A protein has these predicted regions:
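ATP-dependent carboxylate activation and anion-phosphoryl transfer catalytic cores
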Residues: 90-169
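Phosphate-binding site of ATP-dependent enzymes
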Residues: 14-98, 126-130
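Gly/Ser/Thr-rich beta-alpha loop segments that engage phosphate groups in nucleotides
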Residues: 7, 11, 43, 141
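Conserved anion/nucleotide-ligand pocket segment
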Residues: 1-21
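Short Gly/Pro-enriched turn/cap motifs at secondary-structure boundaries
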Residues: 1-2, 36-38, 104-109
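Generic detector of well-ordered alpha-helical packing
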Residues: 1, 37, 44-46, 117, ...
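Short connector loops/turns at beta-strand edges and beta->alpha or beta->beta junctions
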Residues: 1-4, 77, 137-139
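Short small-residue beta-strand/loop micro-motif enriched in glycine and branched aliphatics
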Residues: 5-7, 81-84, 142-146
Length: 169
């Protein structure tokens, strides 16, 4: 589905015979469907917020699941391990943080957002950062990525949200 969230209606298609059933499932969720190539690699998510006074790029979270991809079951039925901070090389962590900040600025984002990436390998075996999606209204439950990242940064979510509201402009 081109809209919605939580990977509702999303399938991983490995051969042509799986395409039609996957499309049927997707169209049950939305009247618009998007097909994209699969990127093999490590999925990470990084939160960021900016106020009139500062930029805070939160520690990235690494997503580890035994499922085919980070699907609904992995997200909501405990079939995932979330590691914050993500196990990235210092160079890759810096590249992701700079990319996250640049995307925030390009979008003229406000408040707190989260950007998901796949870290794949290039032909020389070096990390390649691939932006997957931008979440402008990220989840804020106690187990969501942003609160985890805020805690990993040694911050309190109430203080962060107050800071954003009080110092946005």
């Amino acid at each position: 589905p081109a809209a919605d969230g939580s990977s509702f209606g999303v399938s991983k298609v490995k051969n042509a015979d799986q395409l039609a059933p996957a499309l049927r499932v997707a169209f049950m969720e939305s009247n618009e469907v998007m097909i994209e190539g699969f990127l093999d690699g490590t999925e990470i998510s990084q939160g960021i917020y900016k106020t009139a006074e500062k930029t805070v790029v939160l520690p990235a979270t690494e997503v580890v699941t035994a499922n085919e991809f980070f699907d609904y079951d992995a997200k909501y039925n405990g079939q995932v391990q979330e590691i914050t901070p993500a196990r990235l090389s210092p160079e890759t962590a810096e590249e992701v943080a700079k990319t996250t900040s640049r995307i925030y600025d390009i979008l003229h984002a406000n408040g707190i957002i989260r950007i998901d990436y796949i870290i794949s390998k290039d032909k020389d075996g070096k990390d390649k950062v691939n932006m997957l999606e931008i979440n402008t209204t990220p989840g804020m439950t106690v187990t969501s990525f942003i609160p985890q990242q805020v805690r990993a940064a040694g911050l309190d979510i109430k203080d962060v949200l107050s800071e954003i509201v009080e110092n946005q402009f």
